[in-house]
Amino acid sequence: MSDDKKIIFSMQGVSKIHPPNKQVLKDIYLSFFYGAKIGILGLNGAGKSTLLRIIAGKDESYQGDVVFTPGYSVGFLEQEPELDEAKTVKEVVKEGVADTIKLLEEYEDINKQFEKPEVYEDPDKMEKLMERQGKLQDKIDSSGAWEIDQTLNRAMDALNCPDEDKKIEVLSGGEKRRVALCRLLLQKPDILLLDEPTNHLDIESIIWLEGFLNNYPGAVVIVSHDKMFLDNVT
């Protein structure tokens, strides 16, 4: 979804107090359009991560007004992302393209249906199945689903993800963040919220990420201590 002339998010007079009485945000105003690129700088403890959590809808204990236009998807990279420890790296990354994989699975199921006598001996069933297959193939073609394996491998290589067969439970914190970032970028949400995305990335991966975000059609809000990265992206 896109409408670069429409404000899709608005925050008015938002404040946040941590018990017993520590104010981390005070009277914050923020609005942005689809496609906006926003960088957030601040001292440690200034409430940057809290601000992202409020935008993501993960923190609702604040004062003020937050308005999100319905129909826009949000993706959030937290500093300590939650991943299924029992899954492999490849399985987690594939969660980012779950809808695309469903298209391919449905297409394979249709092909199996053609092999059944009760289908290929019935002209009406064959016609309906062929029509369904044609519509599905159009979706697959337009989404680039045929190249999904190459897409996954390129993204994992670009972010220097661990071996695809490794279990999440054995990964370091930095490796988990790279896997989570890879999954999130493949999801392509309308709004990307990135909390210190360059942490644990090498220079080649940072350069790749800069290019990816510069070409990203949706809105991007980044918290980062890396001013050069922010200058290159926002």
Features from the language model and the residues they span:
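ABC ATP-binding cassette signature C-motif
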Residues: 1-234
